[in-house]
């Protein structure tokens, strides 16, 4: 069977969806060799980074602002996404051995975390736009209660967006092994396949990039009125870094997903092209997954105050256990750390929440 953009592995040996059966054994063999170690690396680095953000926000910052709430939910989204990777790694190397219920559970967690991460990146972008461009209005709406309400709504939307994957994905025996993959109704196969692909492209690429372009354009216009050229340049570099990183990590996957779904339209409905697209899907999807490893860096650790919290957390909970008499453990107050940017110009908001 062919790839539907719903699970991050390739479980087939032959594709019967073409005019003649297409051998996919090489694709499966490559996936079995490369995907498990790659998924493992993404899991390790992503889990450590996002767990650090989670622990610092809970134990140190105490969720005092809308930005803190969105950062916490972004970390939770990434953690949900990452927790499924060990199971997909095992699936890529072998077959699905965890049963039908767990197939649906892990598919649901994967996509809820996936869409949740995207939606909270969008919320963080809009939040920064309001804080910098419409500062007076932001003082009224950027409350903790508002952050909680919008987060609950965002999770509901993420669950709703993931429902087709949860409903249609199931585990069943195909040939000599069990798979965990989407199975659309035969009479509506092409509709659901196209719908799923267009949904992924719109929600994971077009929508976030559109929001980033609009919001960051307004932020840049405001920052260019800043008198401190050095601080302004740093903020501008950070903004462009966020957009470029997101574009580079997710655009290849969405392009390959479109080409794979509409192979006949693009004249790629032959066995050779299908195999190459499958291999490209493996590479680009893994590349996109690594973006969740960068989220803690580009959305949290760029802030000087957040790095101060990280330093205090590290000294208090990690190194102190091995060196109780070291003078380095004198308690610092992160709230007294100077920010990179001042609130009067709005650059502080860029450094702590972009």
Swiss-Prot record:
Record carries keyword Ribosomal protein: no
Record: glycosylation sites: 6
Extracellular side: 1-32, 92-104, 169-200, 263-279
Residues found modified as Sulfotyrosine: 10, 12, 16
Domain of life, source organism: Eukaryota
Residue ranges annotated as Cytoplasmic topological domain: 61-70, 127-143, 221-237, 304-354
Pfam family, one: 7tm_1
Any one Gene Ontology BP term: inflammatory response
Record keyword Metal-binding present: no
Cell location: Cell membrane
Any single Gene Ontology cellular-component annotation: endosome
Gene Ontology terms, MF aspect: actin binding; C-C chemokine binding; C-C chemokine receptor activity; chemokine (C-C motif) ligand 5 binding; identical protein binding
Covalent lipid sites (S-palmitoyl cysteine): 323, 326
Modified-residue entries (Phosphoserine), positions: 338-339, 344, 351
Post-translational modification: Sulfated on at least 2 of the N-terminal tyrosines. Sulfation is required for efficient binding of the chemokines, CCL3 and CCL4. O-glycosylated, but not N-glycosylated. Ser-6 appears to be the major site. Also sialylated glycans present which contribute to chemokine binding.
Protein keywords: Cell membrane, Disulfide bond, G-protein coupled receptor, Glycoprotein, Lipoprotein, Membrane, Palmitate, Phosphoprotein, Receptor, Sulfation, Transducer, Transmembrane, Transmembrane helix
Disulfide bridges in this chain: 22-271, 103-180
Record family assignment: Belongs to the G-protein coupled receptor 1 family.
PANTHER family cross-referenced by the UniProt entry: C-C CHEMOKINE RECEPTOR TYPE 5, CELL ADHESION MOLECULE
Quaternary data: Interacts with PRAF2. Efficient ligand binding to CCL3/MIP-1alpha and CCL4/MIP-1beta requires sulfation, O-glycosylation and sialic acid modifications. Glycosylation on Ser-6 is required for efficient binding of CCL4. Interacts with GRK2. Interacts with ARRB1 and ARRB2. Interacts with CNIH4. Interacts with S100A4; this interaction stimulates T-lymphocyte chemotaxis.
Protein name: C-C chemokine receptor type 5
Organism (species): Mus musculus
Gene: Ccr5
């Amino acid at each position: 069977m062919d790839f539907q953009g719903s699970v991050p592995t390739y479980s087939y040996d032959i594709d019967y969806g073409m005019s003649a059966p297409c051998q996919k054994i090489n694709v499966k063999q490559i996936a079995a060799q490369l995907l498990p170690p790659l998924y493992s690396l993404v899991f390790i680095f992503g889990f450590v980074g996002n767990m650090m953000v989670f622990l610092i926000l809970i134990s140190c910052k105490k969720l005092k602002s809308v930005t803190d709430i969105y950062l916490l939910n972004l970390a939770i989204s990434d953690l949900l996404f990452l927790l499924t990777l060990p199971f997909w790694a095992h699936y890529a190397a072998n077959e699905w051995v965890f049963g039908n219920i767990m197939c649906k559970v892990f598919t649901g967690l994967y996509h809820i975390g996936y869409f949740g991460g995207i939606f909270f990146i969008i919320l963080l972008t809009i939040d920064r736009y309001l804080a910098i461009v419409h500062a007076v209005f932001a003082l009224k709406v950027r409350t903790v209660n508002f952050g909680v309400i919008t987060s609950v709504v965002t999770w509901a939307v993420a669950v709703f967006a993931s429902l087709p994957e949860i409903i249609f994905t199931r585990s069943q025996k195909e040939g000599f092994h069990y798979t965990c993959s989407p199975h659309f109704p035969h009479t509506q196969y092409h509709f659901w396949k196209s719908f799923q692909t267009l949904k992924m492209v719109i929600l994971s690429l077009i929508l976030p990039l559109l929001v980033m372009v609009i919001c960051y354009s307004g932020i840049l216009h405001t920052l260019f009125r800043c008198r401190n050229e050095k601080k302004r340049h740093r903020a501008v570099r950070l903004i462009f870094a966020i957009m470029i990183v997101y574009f580079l990590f997710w655009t290849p996957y969405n392009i390959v997903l479109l080409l794979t779904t509409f192979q006949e339209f693009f004249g790629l409905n032959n066995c050779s092209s299908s195999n190459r697209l499958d291999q490209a899907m493996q590479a680009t999807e893994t590349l996109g997954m690594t973006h969740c490893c960068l989220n803690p860096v580009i959305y949290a650790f760029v802030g000087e105050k957040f790095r101060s919290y990280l330093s205090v957390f590290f000294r208090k909970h990690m190194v102190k256990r091995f060196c109780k008499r070291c003078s380095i453990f004198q308690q610092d107050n992160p709230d007294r750390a100077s920010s990179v940017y001042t609130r009067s110009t709005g650059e502080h908001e860029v450094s702590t929440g972009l």
